[in-house]
Amino acid sequence: MSTGLLAKKVGMTQIFTPEGDCVPVTVLEAGPCTVVRRKTAEKDGYDAVVIGFGVVDEKHAHRLSKPEVGVFKKAGTPIFRHVKEIRVKDAKQLGDLKAGDVLTVDKVFKANQRIDVAGVTKGRGFTGVMKRWNMKGAARDSSTAHEHHRHVGAIGQRKTPGKVWKGKHLPGHYGVDNVTIQNLTVVGIEAEQNVLLVSGAVPGHADGLLFVNTAAKGQPRIKQKQEVRERAKPKV
C-alpha cells in the first residue's frame, strides 16, 4: 500500500544513536486518518484516495456546505477539519482500501524509511532584501544615510533597457510558502501515541498541518542501483 498521512507538527527534540551521535528530530502527530472516499479510474478518471484528519464537533457542521457534509455522511465517517486527496498511478498501490478504513502511522510507514514532508512555512511579514534574499548590504561606515546599509541599492541599468527586470529581488512579503522537504528519514515510530520521529526540520510552526508521504526520489533510486549491481555480476 502506497499512501500518506496528514500530520501535526508537535516540536523538535534530539535523540542519541547507539554510537553516541546526537540526531535532531521533529516530532509529528501523524494520523490516525480515515478514508473518506475511494476514487477509481473507471468512475472518476483516475485512481485516488481521500483521507480526513482532525475530527470536528457536530455543532460546527453548519460551517460546511451541504455537499461537503453529504460526503462524510455517505462514507459513514465523522466530519473532519482537514481533507487530502492522494493520487496514485496504479490502483494496486492502494490495495483494498475503502471508505471508513483507518490509516495509522505503523501501517503506512516503517523505521529508516525515506519520506517527503510538505507544509506551509512560517509567515515573516513584510521584510527587507537582507532577510528575504540574504543580500550582503552596503558598507557600514558613518557616512551612509540612516539604515542605508540595509537598502537594496540600484535596481536598474542605464537607458537600455530602461526598466526593472521581472523577478528582481526586492523587499516584500516573506514566508507562508508551500514547501516540500525531500528524503527525510523516519527515525522512530510510537504507534500507541501516533507519533512519528523524523530526522531534521520540517516547514511550519508548531501545531501546523503537514502532509507526510513516501519519498518520490529516494526509494526508486536505491532500487535502480540494486538492479545495476545485479546486471553487473559476472555470469557463471
Curated annotation (Swiss-Prot):
The lineage of its organism: Bacteria, Pseudomonadati, Myxococcota, Myxococcia, Myxococcales. Pfam families: Ribosomal_L3. One of its GO terms (biological process) is translation. The keyword rRNA-binding applies. Part of the 50S ribosomal subunit. Forms a cluster with proteins L14 and L19. Belongs to the universal ribosomal protein uL3 family. Signal peptide: none annotated. GO terms for cellular component: cytosolic large ribosomal subunit. One of the primary rRNA binding proteins, it binds directly near the 3'-end of the 23S rRNA, where it nucleates assembly of the 50S subunit. Keywords: Ribonucleoprotein, Ribosomal protein, RNA-binding, rRNA-binding. InterPro entries: Ribosomal_uL3 (IPR000597), Ribosomal_uL3_bac/org-type (IPR019927), Ribosomal_uL3_CS (IPR019926), Transl_B-barrel_sf (IPR009000). It comes from Anaeromyxobacter sp. (strain K). Disulfide bonds: none annotated. The keyword Ribosomal protein applies. HAMAP family: Ribosomal_uL3_B (MF_01325_B). This is Large ribosomal subunit protein uL3.
